[in-house]
Curated annotation (Swiss-Prot):
Residues 7-22 have a biased composition (Basic and acidic residues). The gene is TAR1. It catalyses: L-tryptophan + 2-oxoglutarate = indole-3-pyruvate + L-glutamate; L-tryptophan + pyruvate = indole-3-pyruvate + L-alanine. This is Tryptophan aminotransferase-related protein 1. It comes from the Eukaryota. It is found in: Cytoplasm. One of its GO terms (biological process) is cotyledon vascular tissue pattern formation. Induction: Slightly up-regulated by ethylene.
Length: 388
């Protein structure tokens, strides 16, 4: 089977031809969002940031703000972008900036659990869940909270916090809370992928605590910027306290870069020829079509099917093209180990609370890595091709 290649410039990881003939390992375990690099190369004159040596020297940005290290211009840019896309309410909310959404998730766990009268607070998420949640809830062995696993089977009495990722990482499904009681429960809505290049924007999310990350919108993971939209001032204050102890704020250089790029997104989002979201949607759609072509050409793998829905941002019915593929194997076998033999690294389903015959595959790699991963996947035509 021939697997087509997307048009792309040679990246710093080498050419498509060289890599396909080599023994290079393709790492699709990490969600390193380098897929959009080509778009930003064309924006170098409009998105380059120059910072004088004397600027941004203070710890403080706005001492009157609950989040005193949040740059005022970044706050404006965040509100403007959410307003333009229509994916989240920002009115009557406090914006807390963090070093990526992972730090903010930990800050939110601290804030919500420390405000609880009963401790430790149970932390749950529905299977398959984002694997890092387990690490974030368990690493410090905190007395404030404790990881309790699958939200669907959770029946423990007492306070709890449910982590809801929508669209879900790893399977791309839109999610709502599943714990069958509300007494003593709090919810953290992780909306990192609720953007129109991944999924139709069907409504404006309006929750008490919502997390977003710069990296998964634009691909600028190296800037380490995320933000939380928080309704309760006491929760916001607790989160800021955690961030103050943890890192004494967030890099102003990163905030300045994020401000420039978010403003560019807002400015061009309705211009089809320049819109990042148009570009991102077409790229993700193409990648998913090519992956499905490979999967459907054989009898070894499975992928989730996603319903089409009307996107309020694009004004038309669209398909879903998640940032990760939840790839399944039709027999009970460790799919991660099988793909590793093909020199493709993925995240095993057991890390997401599921069976090892599932893996999470990043759809956000550079073009050449994605192309070669499809070529290697295509060599596994059916179950008979694989030695037991």
């Amino acid at each position: 089977m021939m697997v087509g290649c997307e048009n792309s410039k040679k990246s710093d990881s080498g050419s498509n031809e060289d890599k396909s003939l080599s023994d290079d390992i393709i790492n699709l375990d990490q969600g390193d969002p380098t897929a959009f690099q080509e778009y930003w190369m064309k924006k170098k004159d409009r998105c380059t940031v120059v910072i004088p040596a004397w600027d941004l020297m203070s710890y403080f940005s706005d001492t009157k703000n609950v989040c005193w290290f949040l740059e005022p211009e970044l706050e404006k840019a965040i509100k403007a972008l959410h307003g333009a896309i229509g994916n989240a309410a920002t009115e009557e909310r406090y914006i807390v900036v963090g070093t990526g959404s992972s730090q903010l998730c930990q800050a939110a766990l601290f804030a919500l659990s420390s405000l609880s009268e009963v401790k430790p607070v149970s932390i749950v998420a529905a299977v398959p869940y984002y694997s890092t949640y387990v690490e974030e809830a368990s690493y410090l062995q905190s007395t404030l909270y404790k990881w309790e696993g699958d939200a669907r089977t959770f029946d423990k009495k007492g306070p709890y916090i449910e982590l809801v990722t929508s669209p879900n990482n790893p399977d791309g499904i839109m999610r709502e809370p599943v714990v069958n009681r509300r007494e003593g429960g709090k919810v953290i809505h992780d909306l990192a992928y609720y953007w129109p290049h991944y999924t139709p924007i069907t409504r404006r999310q309006d929750h008490d605590l919502m997390l977003f990350t710069f990296s998964k919108i634009t691909g600028h993971a190296g800037s380490r910027i995320g933000w939380a939209l928080v309704k309760d001032i006491e929760v916001a204050k607790k989160m800021v306290h955690y961030l103050t102890i943890n890192s004494i704020g967030v890099s102003k250089e990163s905030q300045t870069r994020a401000t420039t790029i978010l403003n560019e997104l807002t400015k061009t989002c309705r211009t089809q020829s320049e819109s990042f979201f148009e570009y991102g949607y077409e790229k993700m759609k193409s990648r998913w079509e090519r992956l499905r072509e490979v999967v459907e050409s054989g009898d070894a793998f499975t992928l989730p099917n996603y319903p089409q829905d009307f996107c309020n941002f694009f004004g038309k019915t669209l398909s879903t093209s998640p940032a990760f593929a939840w790839l399944g194997y039709k027999e009970e076998r460790d799919l991660g180990s099988l793909l590793k033999e093909k020199k493709v690294l993925t995240r095993g389903g057991d890390r997401c609370g599921c069976n090892k015959r599932y893996v999470r595959v990043s759809m956000l790699s550079r073009d050449d890595d994605f192309d070669v991963s499809l070529q290697r996947l295509a060599t596994i035509k059916d179950l008979k091709c694989v030695e037991p």
